[in-house]
């Protein structure tokens, strides 16, 4: 008998450790739009914490915030898309990004910690263990980790590819119970209709999924690839419209919005398994294969 979405409602409600991924588009619109989004996000995460849940936030947006900062400078400086320019923008914008989050989370008495890392950090002998230990300690202290790839030093050859894959890797490292990806659409669409439930990710699904439509590097394709990876590990993934009010809270309470990708296995991913995924998926080595 095939599983149905409703059969996972209890698993979703009882998820103890939740990774939430926010894309660049949610943080690069008009100031009023960004503020409205952050008010909703912070309120929902505060609600999760009050329920006793552990939350890790994976956030893009450093380069987008860097471009905004550059545009505000009283000069004629402009930026393109060269590697050096994107690295410099990330260096400028990451500080702004974390300060923005801190200003909102402090209003609900949540302390945050910035975690920046890259492919080479995880491939080093002690890097994986140190990162896992850092996550564990922060969560035990009740601190909210805010995670991003260290784009100021990452090159195209040694990048995770996008933060959808980064959020999946973080989910494996921290042994999460649920990944929530916030995007700008209502979920995975077929013929302009939301697909509410995917038992598994097929090649047809990937063929219908599009690339980035905003300032980010991912798209629905990378979201489905990441969800497919976590499905093997028994971790469900929800793809939700981050523009909707209290979308995280509504999903957990009702399990009736967005696209839910079901867990299909219970594979335990070892440190070496995660490192192999990184080697296969980083930009300079095979692109999108899993």
Curated annotation (Swiss-Prot):
Its chief place of residence is cytoplasm
Say which species the protein is native to. Leptospira interrogans serogroup Icterohaemorrhagiae serovar Lai (strain 56601)
Role played: Catalyzes the transfer of a phosphate group to glutamate to form L-glutamate 5-phosphate.
EC annotation from Swiss-Prot or TrEMBL:
2.7.2.11
Q: In which pathway does it act?
A: Amino-acid biosynthesis; L-proline biosynthesis; L-glutamate 5-semialdehyde from L-glutamate: step 1/2
Chain positions recorded as ATP binding sites: 21, 217-223
What family does the database annotate? Belongs to the glutamate 5-kinase family.
Instruction: State the InterPro entries in the record.
Output: AceGlu_kinase-like_sf, Asp/Glu/Uridylate_kinase, G5K_ProB, Glu/AcGlu_kinase, Glu_5kinase, Glu_5kinase/COase_Synthase, Glutamate_5-kinase_CS
Keywords of the record, alphabetical order, are: Amino-acid biosynthesis, ATP-binding, Cytoplasm, Kinase, Nucleotide-binding, Proline biosynthesis, Transferase
Which domain of life, per UniProt? Bacteria
Q: Which reaction does it catalyse?
A: L-glutamate + ATP = L-glutamyl 5-phosphate + ADP
What GO annotations for molecular function exist for this entry?
A: ATP binding; glutamate 5-kinase activity
Query: Which residues are recorded as binding substrate?
Result: 60, 151, 163
What gene makes this protein? proB
What is any Pfam family matched here?
A: AA_kinase
Asked if the Swiss-Prot or TrEMBL record annotates the protein with the keyword Repeat, the reply is no
Among PROSITE patterns, the record links this protein to: GLUTAMATE_5_KINASE
Q: Name one GO cellular component term.
A: cytosol
State what protein this is by name: Glutamate 5-kinase
Give the UniProt subcellular location, in the record's own words: Cytoplasm
**UniProt-listed GO biological process terms:** L-proline biosynthetic process; proline biosynthetic process
